[in-house]
Amino acid sequence: MQGYASEVKANTQVLIITHASKNVSEQGIKDPLVYPGAPHTHLLEQVFDNLEQRIGLTDAVISFDHKIDCDISRIYLQNLRNFCERRHARLIVSPSSLQMHNQLTATAAFLRGMRAISSEYVLLFEHDHFFLDSVDWSTVDLAFAGGIGLLRFNEFDNTSKPEMFEVVSPSSISNQLCETNYYCNKPYIAKAQFCKQLFELAERDVPNWNGHFGSLVEGPIMRQIMADEFNLSREEFRRRYPIALYGPLGAPPMIEHFGVFPGRRARWTKALKSWLKRG
């Protein structure tokens, strides 16, 4: 919507979480995974351009899970410093080690990044995601005016996912929104205070591989959300976790994930080239 002045947009900073490598031994993968862009910042350049094109936001904090015992991570750190100076972003370094559990180090990076956010709202964005379409900020404003605390942008279509224990239903706020009982780290806009409260759920949990619950901060957060869903009334649960999906029921994905897990590298390269051609 051209010319629309969004209250939420005017009070939102971007928080980007990044790493050069990570320990995934809890998933049965022996060698550390390396972020496809590291030690360069080429992909981050594309992420920033995408954020500017699709949502008009580049006021960013970049929180770096820095493995101090990893050569690639040390080179990436210097490149990140140069990138942040050039793109006017604030860099937060969260030191860790390849010997440490990834859920622990990622959670620390999330928390340190959130503490650097000074705006009322935050757009959380991991370093390997792109928006596929522009965001209608009037819908975003409507969501938060209606009491939503966290508005997710889906990597999949807006339907229930029984295998993930996610229930998606139309929202009473707008037919351009859906209710969901599910938290994940796919890009979302949230009230910063609500986001900090969720991250504190992860901070208090013992790091382990969570199976259905997710491998990073999603794991302990979703375990607590699910426990409350079992034990609270629907009204109490929605008051505690006012989470929504952007778009109507059945809407197509808003997000593309260029992840680093085995088998995704070819898809990442193909999708990135395709996106670059779109301009």
Segment roles from a protein language model:
Residues 12-40, 54:
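A conserved hydrophobic helix/loop-capping motif in glycosyltransferases and polysaccharide synthases
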Residues 14-24, 64-66, 93-96, 126-128, ...:
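Short loop/turn segments at strand-loop or loop-helix junctions that form parts
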Residues 30-31, 65-117:
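Active-site-proximal specificity loops/subdomain of glycosyltransferases
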Residues 120-130:
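Short beta-strand-to-loop acidic/aromatic patch adjacent to the donor-nucleotide binding site
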Residues 133-158:
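Conserved donor-nucleotide/metal-binding helix-loop-beta segment in metal-dependent transferases, i.e.
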Residues 150, 176-271:
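Catalytic core and acceptor-binding pocket of nucleotide-sugar-dependent glycosyltransferases
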